């Protein structure tokens, strides 16, 4: 994890720091050449995922896998991308993040059809207002935000590590570490610490008692950050795969909130804040690319925002 994160958390958690990040810190444009490389983007048919896919292709990416829940929506996005970037191979693969079986099938297909993946950006996520459990019969009934944003995301990340660290077929090719970027959020600064101390973490996150959708979202992203820090420190060398977390900030035009807020006043405040200070999906997606392409081994296990390693 970023060395100074724990020491700067209080400062970064202030509303003033949030506004500074949103309004005064520019998100750098990413340049480079991804010719010959293969990338996966989950949740890639809308919002930040689609903007990320478009930017990867603009850097001459050769092969892009759009990993999506809805094949119909994914195919529509792929047609648009293919028309704009005819040089690339754009494929749509099914990935249901509520199902471990779907995740395993997706990774099995990666091994059989791709051999090597250079970049994986795990963008799929959601936020719910009410407590709901997964309905997939192949998945243990858990709260959906916890399942999709954390448990399924880290399961997918672990399964992708071997193919991200695979060597190129050419024996004389210089090995370049794979890149694995999980999408986080700077809302981790606002997690209720008392709740984390009251009982085991997963037990607290899987309880309907006093459920708060925004608190659940923040907690799920904190778990992702903790996982990446542990993974990078103890299990994965940056010489094989560079793993980090990208925080796009508050963005407009995203579709991760699956249901409207019944409190119209609260909804109006949130909508106004997004309209006034929210970044465009294109700006947010630049953070993904900065983490997955520009940042080197120093970012291993760290959180990236505005193109820089946080605090």
Swiss-Prot record:
Entry EC no(s): 1.1.1.-
Disulphide bridges, residue numbers: none
Keyword Nucleotide-binding belongs to the record: no
Keyword Oxidoreductase: yes
Phenotype of the disrupted gene, per the record: Does not affect the production of oxopyrrolidines A and B.
Family annotation (InterPro entries): NAD(P)-bd_dom_sf (IPR036291), SDR_fam (IPR002347)
Active site residues of this protein: 217 (proton donor), 221 (lowers pka of active site tyr)
Pathway: Secondary metabolite biosynthesis
GO terms assigned for molecular function: oxidoreductase activity
Binding site for NADP(+): 48, 73, 96, 123, 217, 221
Keyword vocabulary terms for this entry: NADP, Oxidoreductase
Family the UniProt entry places it in: Belongs to the short-chain dehydrogenases/reductases (SDR) family.
Name of the protein: Short chain dehydrogenase opdN
Organism in which the protein naturally occurs: Penicillium oxalicum (strain 114-2 / CGMCC 5302) (Penicillium decumbens)
């Amino acid at each position: 994890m970023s060395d100074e994160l724990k020491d700067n958390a209080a400062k970064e958690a202030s509303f003033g720091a949030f506004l500074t990040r949103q309004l005064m810190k520019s998100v750098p444009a990413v340049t480079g050449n991804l010719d010959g490389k293969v990338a996966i983007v989950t949740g890639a048919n809308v919002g930040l995922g689609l903007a990320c896919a478009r930017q990867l292709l603009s850097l001459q990416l050769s092969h892009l896998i759009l990993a999506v829940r809805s094949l119909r929506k994914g195919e529509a996005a792929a047609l648009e991308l293919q028309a704009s970037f005819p040089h690339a191979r754009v494929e749509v693969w099914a990935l249901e993040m509520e199902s471990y079986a779907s995740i395993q099938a997706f990774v099995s297909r990666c091994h059989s059809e791709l051999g090597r993946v250079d970049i994986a950006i795990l963008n799929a996520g959601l936020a719910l207002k009410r407590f709901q459990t997964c309905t997939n019969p192949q998945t243990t009934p858990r709260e959906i935000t916890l399942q999709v944003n954390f448990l399924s995301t880290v399961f997918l990340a672990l399964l992708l590590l071997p193919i991200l660290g695979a060597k190129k077929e050419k024996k004389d090719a210089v090995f370049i570490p794979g890149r694995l970027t999980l999408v986080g959020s700077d809302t981790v600064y606002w997690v209720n610490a008392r709740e984390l101390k009251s009982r085991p973490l997963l037990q607290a996150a899987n309880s309907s008692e006093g459920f708060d959708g925004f608190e659940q979202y923040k907690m799920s992203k904190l778990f992702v950050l903790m996982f990446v820090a542990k993974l990078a420190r103890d299990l994965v060398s940056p010489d094989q795969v560079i793993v980090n977390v990208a925080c796009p900030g508050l963005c407009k035009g995203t579709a991760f909130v699956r249901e409207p807020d019944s409190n119209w006043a609260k909804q109006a405040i949130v909508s106004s804040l997004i309209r006034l200070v929210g970044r465009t999906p294109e700006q947010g997606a630049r953070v993904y690319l900065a983490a997955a392409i520009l940042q080197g081994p120093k970012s291993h296990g760290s959180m990236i925002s505005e193109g820089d390693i946080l605090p």
